Amino acid sequence: MDKDKGSIIHEPLVPRTFRLLAELEKEGDGIVSYGLENPEDNTFTNWNGSILANNGILYELKIVCDNNYPKVPPKVKFVTKINLPCVNQSNGEILPNSLNVLKNWNRDCTIESYLQAIKSEMDSNLTKLKQPPEGSKF
């Protein structure tokens, strides 16, 4: 709220496509990475992701940014089998509200911040929980 005028200042919303294009150009940090499943997809809906865990295993993920992104988080699903409290063990999907980034999702959150939160969960739990054989898929 502008203290001098008593009015609310609204920042313009960046269109979904521009936002996702900016995220695509960033692509992650090598430990956490992501990109379009199909480089010709001008809807920016279907993405691939990967997370290099501390155990040296590269975990693959599928990411879907529907038309409500970034207002709502993308759907994220592990392709590589993993045992984590935040993952549905029957299909690999990240459970709703299982991570702080999901509980506190807002337009400033990104695909990268979501994947970083998953990486943090992996760092905390991979060695504590029995994991499926390397290379197994959901």
Residue spans for each PLM region:
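UBC/E2-like fold recognition across ubiquitin and ubiquitin-like conjugation systems
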Residues: 1-138
